[in-house]
Amino acid sequence: MKRAIESLGQTADIKTDNFDTIEGSYDRIWTLSESLLPVQAQLEIKLGLKNLSVSAAEVLTDKKKFDDFCIAIGLGDMIPKSVIPTCEEDLFDGDLIVKPTVGSGTKLDGFSYTSYHSKEELLNNIPDNFFETNKKGFTDPKFNNVQSYYMVQEMLPTYSEVYGYYAYIDMDGNVHRQFCVKLDTKLIRYGNSKYYNHPYVIQSIDEDEVPDIVKESSEIFYESIADVLGVRNMFISGPDFYVYDGITKMIDCNPRIGTGNTLMDKAMGFTVIPDIISNKKIQYNKHFIWRQADLKPGTIKRVKDYSHLKEYISETSHELHEGKVIAEQTNASDSIFNMSIIVLGTKKPDMQKTYQAVKEELQNSIEYY
């Protein structure tokens, strides 16, 4: 983002803490984590900006308020059933997932974002003080100490087709849907009761591959973010649309630039973000694949030089070296072990072949104990 702004001859300041000390004249703020949106809203007031209100920040930060907003704009049929339980009787039957109302699906702690096949299995795994904690709520310093609660939500089928758009709202409130991605998910079981279902492949797709219901619903959603919430100058990643058995549901919206935008920017010669900032029309003519390498689990005895492959390896991937334990990867940004391959290009069949070739060469470079 900073590089894009400076390429246009403008200046940018990056702040990671001490936000209350920010002074000066600015025309817009971009927040790279939704947990900081409340801070941005306060800074907007302080600096005399009108891109994000306090109430809009709350809707885009809190999953329960997000669901309530979607219901209010006519998308209620797409919102999964959920509850913030304060007693056992509040829970409902079926496959369930536990989410903090303020948090990220990549921040796993053994309980948050874990799924269960039944109410009984959830009850067998909840902390002793779960219901009492949920009565008063809790805060997490990783998410700017915003008040949060545990939300128990209907778990959507693991065989769903999952789609999500990247979009942005410009300074005049015009919505620009950029491109859509398709996410392939993988179910990881923990014992007999717990499981995760996270994406292991994220790839951009052509507009004619997107279901009409996803196009129509995303348009309603983005226009409402701009018109009802009054949001301006914001990148949006999501929501994720789950399509299954003739049903479509939507979850989660991340008001940030997102990895997909970063990859598309790189694929198109680092022109996307500058063109967005300059309000230029963009023709997206490239694609990306971001996929786990799915390396064989084990402990590395030795590894051959693979530096020539690093142009295809994500920046968040872990280094391979003697003694490194390769664990089963749960998602494309797993903090325990991550080795993900990124392929940029135009023709998808060629991109898939490149992915497979890089994966095989990487795997063949490893010798295990």
Where are these regions (language model features)?
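Conserved metal-phosphate-binding beta-hairpin within the catalytic cores
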Residues: 222-260, 292-296
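A short, Lys/Arg-enriched amphipathic alpha-helix followed by its capping loop at the start of a domain
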Residues: 3-11
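Conserved N-proximal alpha/beta basic substrate-recognition cap immediately N-terminal to
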Residues: 16-91, 103-106, 337
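Phosphate-binding site of ATP-dependent enzymes
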Residues: 127-189, 209, 238-249
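Conserved anion/nucleotide-ligand pocket segment
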Residues: 95-115
